[in-house]
From Swiss-Prot:
Organism for this UniProt entry: Photorhabdus laumondii subsp. laumondii (strain DSM 15139 / CIP 105565 / TT01)
Entry's Gene Ontology molecular function annotations: metal ion binding; rRNA binding; structural constituent of ribosome
Residue numbers binding Zn(2+): 16, 18, 37, 40
Homology family: Belongs to the bacterial ribosomal protein bL31 family. Type A subfamily.
GO cellular component, as recorded: ribonucleoprotein complex; ribosome
Domain of life, source organism: Bacteria
Record-linked Pfam families: Ribosomal_L31
Any single GO BP term: translation
Swiss-Prot/TrEMBL keywords: Metal-binding, Ribonucleoprotein, Ribosomal protein, RNA-binding, rRNA-binding, Zinc
Function: Binds the 23S rRNA.
Subunit details: Part of the 50S ribosomal subunit.
Protein name per Swiss-Prot or TrEMBL: Large ribosomal subunit protein bL31
Cofactor: Zn(2+)
Cofactor note as given: Binds 1 zinc ion per subunit.
Length: 71
């Protein structure tokens, strides 16, 4: 590789919201904060987690509930 044209590829720390710390190599140059990792992701753990507790449509239906109107 040519010198001086590539970004520095250095070791950084990626910290997950569950508390696990992972050492990775990256060109980002700063520590990363992760929402999920392999130790807490529902696919890998087999546990379900309710991320969305209702959206805007549910809030609208609750707010403007008209009796007798159905789909």
């Amino acid at each position: 590789m040519k010198k001086g044209i590539h970004p520095k590829y250095e070791e950084i720390t990626a910290t997950c919201s569950c508390g696990s710390v992972i050492q990775v190599r990256s060109t980002a140059g700063h520590a990363l904060n992760l929402d999920v990792c392999g130790q807490c992701h529902p696919f890998y753990t087999g546990k379900q987690r309710d991320v969305a507790t209702g959206g805007r449509v549910d809030r609208f239906k609750k707010r403007f509930n008209v009796p007798g109107v159905s789909k």
